[in-house]
């Protein structure tokens, strides 16, 4: 999830795309909420370590409060289940960051 090979270009391109998804989530929530439709997004942090250089994994873990990268197939499930469950009935227009706390220090 963290690798950028799917999104070629400079970091500004990545940031603009990310901001676009956040803005679209909020805009669609405002538009569709009156119809009872909730719109939220999940913003995953670094997931791996499959095929990632060990130095990258170690550096990422050192910069993350939870001390590790996200586990593929495990750490996004809770966020998805929450947003799909009645527990999120009063949540819309939100981007749920699942990054082990990485973004709080950035």
Where do the PLM segments sit?
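Conserved SDR Rossmann-fold cofactor-binding beta-strand/turn motif
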Residues: 38-48, 84, 97-99
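Non-catalytic, hydrophobic alpha-helical segments
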Residues: 75-76, 83
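Catalytic Tyr-x(3-8)-Lys segment
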Residues: 55-74
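Conserved sequence/active-site signature of Rossmann-fold short-chain dehydrogenase/reductase
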Residues: 1-2, 46-48, 52, 101-103
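Short, small/polar-rich loop/turn modules that mediate ligand/substrate recognition or access, typified
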Residues: 33, 38, 91-93
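Short C-terminal tail/terminal secondary-structure segment
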Residues: 81, 92-106
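Catalytic loop of short-chain dehydrogenase/reductase
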Residues: 1-20, 25-34, 46
């Amino acid at each position: 999830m963290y690798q950028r090979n799917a999104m070629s270009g400079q970091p500004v391109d990545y940031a603009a795309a990310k901001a676009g998804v956040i803005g679209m989530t909020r805009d669609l929530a405002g538009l569709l909420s009156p119809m009872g439709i909730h719109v939220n997004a999940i913003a995953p942090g670094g997931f791996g370590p499959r095929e990632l250089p060990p130095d990258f994994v170690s550096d990422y873990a050192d910069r993350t409060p939870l001390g590790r990268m996200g586990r593929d197939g495990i750490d996004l499930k809770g966020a998805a289940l929450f947003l799909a469950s009645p527990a999120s009935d009063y949540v819309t227009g939100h981007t749920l960051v699942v990054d082990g706390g990485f973004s709080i220090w950035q």
